[in-house]
Amino acid sequence: MNIYRTHVCNELGVAHVGNEVALSGWVYRKRDHGGLLFVDLRDFYGITQLIFNESENPELFNRMATIGLESVITVRGIVAERSEDNVNASIETGHVEVKVSTLTVVSEAAPLPLHVPTSFSYPEDIRLQHRFLDLRCDKVKNSILLRSMVVSELRRAMEALGFIEVHTPILTSSSPEGARDYIVPSRTHAGKFYALPQAPQIFKQLLMVGGFDKYFQIAPCFRDEDSRADRSPGEFYQLDMEMSFVTQEDVFAAIEPVLYGLFAKFAGADKKVDRQFPRITYRDSMIRYGSDKPDLRNPLVISDVTEIFRNSGFRTFQAGVEAGEVVRAIPAPNTSGKPRSFFDDKIERAKEFGARGLGYVTYEADGTAKGPIAKFLSEDELARIRSAAGVGNGDSVFFMSDTADKAADFAGKIRELLGLELGLIEHDTFKFCWIVDFPYFKCEDGELDFCHNPFSMPQGEMEALEQQNPLDIIAYQYDIVCNGIEISSGAIRNHRLDVMYKAFSMVGYDEQTVNSKFGALVRAFKFGAPPHGGLAPGIDRIVMLLADAPNIREVICFPLNQTGEDLLMGAPSEVSPAHLQELSIALNIKRK
């Protein structure tokens, strides 16, 4: 027999009335009603109300009155039915209470640094220093429970599709995947270091070369990155998957039902899940949404109106177009009647984003075009703008002119701002999309580099690398975006060694360097590599979306703070000189 409890705190009901029970848990709330002390006892499963009667047992009553909230106690007593006017329908045990006869204090709590029921409203540093208390809050606990259920469902879905779970190494070698590595010094190989994997990229490709057909794992990934709302510094987890003998279409067909089913199961009754996964090219996404992570809940679509302004009378934009700039149009429905302050505010916000300014035209109820730049445009140009932007009478159009990348960024931010301010966002919906056809290369400071994953296959393979302008080459790379959050990246991999050597040579890596950095992959590709591809949905981001959490740290059990510190465990921390000497390490700290 369990000496601490016969039942858990969500278990008792009217069927147990008259039974003697034992319960253990934390003191959640206390209410003194003059001779009757009501205590809510909470455990992992729920809450049960306890009653201490001063007239029946004053010693027990007084002892309980002195016990602080969040202390752990064990009680024994008789289950009693509540009167009808005292029923609490908000808890599972709300029809009964326990009249306590014995009380044992298992662990008394010190004065609390935060109020557990509302811990999520406290400053983050206090919460993280006392995360063990924060986790007792239902809102926080439920996010962690949701994460557990999501992982379980993903594992079930992948196994049902015939995927095999394989755990790949945590200690490995450094690889260029776009972020800084966490490195681990080797004691037995002085001066050498392991790296924590940014992703199991090479290992899963080696599994495919090793003859495995479908692989997955719930993979920990480690990247020394700065924090964002949708990115936690340090580590994160992803559903890593790879398939052999597949095309891009096969990968899409495998993952779409998994993600739709997951969101449909856990979205909740108040959220809809759009079954469609529209495909948007990277180029179209940057033009139409100003981002490669578009939020399709926002119906506003940006238009390219560069050619309309090429020979227009609005000299500011015309000169920019002549210099190679572009002009983007952002529609603003039902705003022509807004006060001047509405438009001035958008201009100021654009400048805050870094733009030089923002033009606009309003189309009045009678069809008349007004606004600061309307007088510089012909009737034909105004009509073409109206058509391109998809607006009508009563609407307005904002204009952004700059280089293509800056215009996309600024226009995208104005689109997002208008969507929120005009109440256009479908907050009760999850909307997915694929972003496809990413550029294979990019040019920064005159140097060619990989745009995303260096291990992806260029569309056109060797012919593309040899005959096309490098900046025109498209990769078999793809992202999944949900509500403006990138939840997965993937690619069809480059399984041809000759194509791999050629691609790396174009960004400055000779064969010897490639062999040195990716020796395992190079050797494997010499012994029969199948075409393969995959992707890796981010579990933290998926749970953040499903939980409607304000940032990713809310769905991680023991997160680092925004500066990469573990306030609970005191990491990162200094190590002893003896430990450093054992690792053959001498510190040379840069002073800020």
Curated annotation (Swiss-Prot):
- Major localization listed first in the record, in broad terms: cytoplasm
Q: What keywords tag this UniProt record?
A: Aminoacyl-tRNA synthetase, ATP-binding, Cytoplasm, Ligase, Nucleotide-binding, Protein biosynthesis
List the InterPro entries hit by this protein, alphabetically: Aa-tRNA-synt_II, aa-tRNA-synth_II, aa-tRNA-synth_II/BPL/LPL, Asp-tRNA-ligase_1, Asp-tRNA-ligase_1_N, Asp/Asn-tRNA-synth_IIb, AspRS_core, GAD-like_sf
**What PROSITE patterns does the record tag this protein with?**
AA_TRNA_LIGASE_II
Q: Pinpoint the site Important for tRNA non-discrimination.
A: 33
Q: Which residues are involved in binding ATP?
A: 223-225, 486, 538-541
Region named Aspartate: 201-204
Q: One Pfam family, short name please?
A: tRNA-synt_2
Per its UniProt record, what NCBIfam families does this chain match? aspS_bact, PRK00476.1
Which family does the UniProt entry place this protein in? Belongs to the class-II aminoacyl-tRNA synthetase family. Type 1 subfamily.
Its quaternary organisation is: Homodimer.
Full protein name: Aspartate--tRNA(Asp/Asn) ligase
